[in-house]
UniProtKB/Swiss-Prot annotation:
It comes from the Bacteria. Keywords: Cell membrane, Membrane, Transmembrane, Transmembrane helix. The chain crosses the membrane at residues 4-24, 30-50, 66-86. One of its GO terms (cellular component) is plasma membrane. The keyword Signal does not apply. It is found in: Cell membrane. This is Putative membrane protein YozS. It is a multi-pass membrane protein.
Amino acid sequence: MKALIFLSSLTAIGSSILGRWLGMLDDSYAVGDAWFIGVLAGLISLLILIDSQTMTKNYIVSLSTILGILGVGFIYFPAAFINILLSITLDKQKKEDLHVR
């Protein structure tokens, strides 16, 4: 689980910075630099490491995925795919927690 979190975060941050360096992302984003939103989405996904409820972690993964795709676009898809795998893992964990109770 922690490996998926770090892989997702590093993929998001790396692809956003690489897209900026290669000139795929320019400064024409209305709010600011689009690459920064991709980096922010990668950092948000690291919040999952904080001990909290599984439902909160699912919301964080969803927010990270949506924010990354809106900010960076198609460059964020590898990280978004990893976030989807992470969300499936969290969903299984939530179901196991419900069966234990």
